[in-house]
Amino acid sequence: MIDFTEEQIQRYSRHILLQDVGVEGQEKIMNARVLVVGAGGLGAPVSLYLAAAGIGTIGIVDADVVDLSNLQRQVIHFTKDVGVPKVKSAEEKIKAINPDVKVETYYEFLDSSNALDIIKEYDFIVD
């Protein structure tokens, strides 16, 4: 059982008030491990929402760097991030939204040579 801090109670109060979530559900969320494949058009907003919800661990796999052309649709990256690996840019924003979230980054492609080793550590995969 997690002993929620006052800050966590306030942060997650809307979840905790929901009959279908409550304290037990928020605890499950905070213990969950989710892998996001790609920090681009889908992975960017998904990562932000997962962090805001309090997912305990978010893994991000992406072998790309932020390009200026990404910024109009990949909301996790900012102009200052151009040239930075997307996983590092995403990690910074996730930690800014919710410092309690653990972020695991994989600056590589997810393919047959590494997929099983990476995904076995996670409860859910978003691709």
Predicted regions and their residues:
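Adenine nucleotide-associated cytosolic modules
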Residues: 1-127
